[in-house]
Amino acid sequence: MHRRTFLKYGSAGLFTLGMGGFLRHAYSQTAPQDESLLRDRVDPCFDNSPRVAPFTVPLAFAPVIDAVGAVQLTEARGEHVFVPGFRTPIWGYEGMFPGPTLVARRNVPVAVTFTNALPPGEDPSGIIIPNNSRQDPVDHPFRDSTTVVHLHGINTDGQLGPGGDGSFSSDGYPEGALALKNPGESRTHQYPNNGTPGQAAPIYQRPATLWYHDHSVHITSVHLYRGLSGFYVLKDVAEEASGLPGSAAADPGRGIEAGPLGFDVPLVVKDVMLAPEEIDGRPPGTLIYNNCSHFGAFGDLMTVNGKQQPFFEVANRKYRFRLLNGSDSRQYLFAFRVAQNLKSGPNEPFRYIGTDQGLLFTGVPEITTFFHANISERHEFVLDFSKYPIGTRIVMVNLLVDQNDERLFPIMEFRVTRVEADHSQADAWPAAAWAHPADVQPAAITRTFRFNRQGGYWSINSMQFDPLRDDAQPLLDTTEDWVLVNESGGWGHPVHIHLGRFKIMKIQGRAPNPGELTGFKDTVWVGPNQTITVRHQFWNFPGRFVFHCHNGSHEDSDMMSQFNVLPNPGTVGTGTLPGGTPS
């Protein structure tokens, strides 16, 4: 197929304006209210990826690394089989997607050394980009294979520079000292997993499901789409003693490390597009990246842990799942249905137990029948298969697409195939074990940030990202209320704030989703005509960090700002500090 023919295919699927962002539901409902308003109205810009029938291939698991002491990871080109019969060139940590799952322990430091072994330049053979996928309003020194690793959700150092460009670097800072600009370069990231090295109790960092990924300026979207991401699961003694499925107390040796035999299961959901035949000399199965004129890269092939719509054989007992929305731009409304009632429902009830920053701080689950998964969010839930006869099939579905769309509606299938004893519980956990003074600290100030579009670019407070400008200067070991405003009627933004965690204080324009008011977060969905107030914690580390829309195409088009955590003279005042728009 020639490029001209491909572009013809691509334009046929262009979207109608907007994306379902009005989540009008309460916990434990049988079905969403006004479900038609939730539909994902952005069709893939290409809809001819090769595929097999849903639930043909088994769920796959990334290798698990015990992250204690020193860990080495190499960013490399590799091949991956999303669909049987097609070998897709990817970029990945250790050349695989998803990258290895790192399992770390709270208050036990780990040093992870990342080495860039990616091909120099653009590596055009590994991806097809039918349009100008990037806008570069400012010059930057990065090549297309430059990388900067971010451990998403970690509380870690902001003073790792200055780099060659004179800026300080924090974990994931898109420009600065930790950039791997040339093949063969290595950088070591120090993760104390507690807040600060040698920190006395109480420890700040909560056990949680985090993830590591590339964060290079203007090319994050393409790099994540190629495969540069992996899980980082942080555990601790209290959680292991909780009796949750896969914990040491309930299921010794049957946690994440046990892979398909474990009862603590990581799932990364990601949509991609693959070339159905040779295009511009590139083989069938090559990744196609089309960000729909900077609105977002949507795929027509649903994958879980890198496999198209897989099945997972389970025992008739409880399982804990840790789900990451690893898509570039697609959001999901997940529900679970018995296979024979796939289209008619009802949705099966389940326990929702955790958000981005760990288990719910209430210490008890929420019973619900669905949850909204925003880009880059993590969700933890427990499915109890003991109530289903052997042979039952349960399907995870996405309610934001047409239920007749076999490509996008069914996500994966759980098959109840065997009997196993269950010594786990999922009704309570010791939330007090992770309490910290920051969690009850009042806000020192309120700032407002408006997420909009200015001069053809995505922007925050009508400004694009500038590493030489601080848009907020919070004081160290304080909290602030940030009002995140989206006045557009057509697009939503998953807003991610680096460094710490936040609590959602107020939601205007929609009802809360499961866990949003009972769990700590680092990413929040700010949909069209919505305003979300979050209380963010700027604890333990001074320095420069960023916050941004986590729709990769928006982020790369400079919907990102920078804050600089300043040393605290010892008093926390009120009023107006530099940066942001005071409220």
Cite the ranges covered by each PLM segment.
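Short solvent-exposed strand-capping/beta-turn motif centered on an Asx-Ser/Thr pair
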Residues: 115-119, 324-329, 485-490
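Short, hydrophobic/aromatic beta-strand segments
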Residues: 121-131, 226, 330-337, 491-497
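Extracellular/periplasmic metallocenter environments
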Residues: 134-242, 363-364, 369-414, 489-490, ...
